[in-house]
Amino acid sequence: MLEGWSVVIDYTASSRPFGMARLLTRYGFRVDRIYADTISPEEEDTIAFLKERCPHILVCPTVHHKMAVLPRGLYEESGGRVLAIGQKAAYFTGTPHFVNMVEDGGLYGCGGILELAGLMQEAAMEEKDTGKLIQVKGWGCFC
């Protein structure tokens, strides 16, 4: 279902975004970006794993001032096959295909992994109205 899709993850979706990336890459998903401003000491081994086995993954800050003006073209560049996990990842890539999840969404263990897989499949099949779901968070609101 998600073969050929690029997956991007942000730190608001998971307390351990690098661990999520490791899990997904081990099961054949192509994770291309992780949006995170800090790296938890608990994830140092995971970072080493990703550097060795997935050197193509970009780690992008979300609070850097240039992030507000960078083009959001990954979605178009990838032929519309970008799946984001988290609202910030959806915003920065411009994709309408995203898992709208915050702080792991209550998912845990094997059941949580299976539920995440279902949410990813659902996000790939159905576009969300990104502008409505991600309102004031830098979307260009003139409030």
Where are the predicted features?
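An N-terminal assembly and electron-transfer interface module characteristic of large anaerobic redox
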Residues: 1-143
